[in-house]
Amino acid sequence: MKEENLCPCDSGKTYVTCCEPYHKQHNAPTAEALMRSRYSAFVFGLVDYLFETTHPNHRAKNLKADIASTCKGLAWTGLDVRDVWQGGEKDKVGKVTFHASFVQEGKNGVHVEHSRFKRFGKAWMYVDGEVKG
């Protein structure tokens, strides 16, 4: 990816100044930053990153295979963060509601999720999400 390319998380920043540092083992400072970096990881098919940023207590047996299947089956086309509750640099928990647009088998769709995040040591981790609609 070229340095000037915008980040797929729709932050308005370039990928190298937005999600790439998190993908290269830097902890996201907030729950929203982690959620955006996970969206970008789905766009790029970064299965290991998505697995590693899922809270250890919430890693299902087939999680890596499920992530890989999702990455291959959907073309993500946009992210709209709708609401953020806590999840700041000094918080221990956070919630982010977002709409993620995608194309699957030539049809447009929107994934609406209310995600929960929790600190694990110094790192924000994805716990789970309530999918709407």
What spans do the regions from the language model cover?
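Short, low-complexity N-terminal intrinsically disordered segments enriched in polar/charged residues
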Residues: 1-37
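Beta-strand-connecting loop/turn residues
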Residues: 5, 92, 122-123
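Short helix-adjacent coil turns
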Residues: 38, 42-49
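Short solvent-exposed beta->alpha transition segments
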Residues: 52-81
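Surface-exposed, charged secondary-structure patches
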Residues: 70-107
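Short beta-strand edge/turn micro-motifs at domain boundaries
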Residues: 110-133
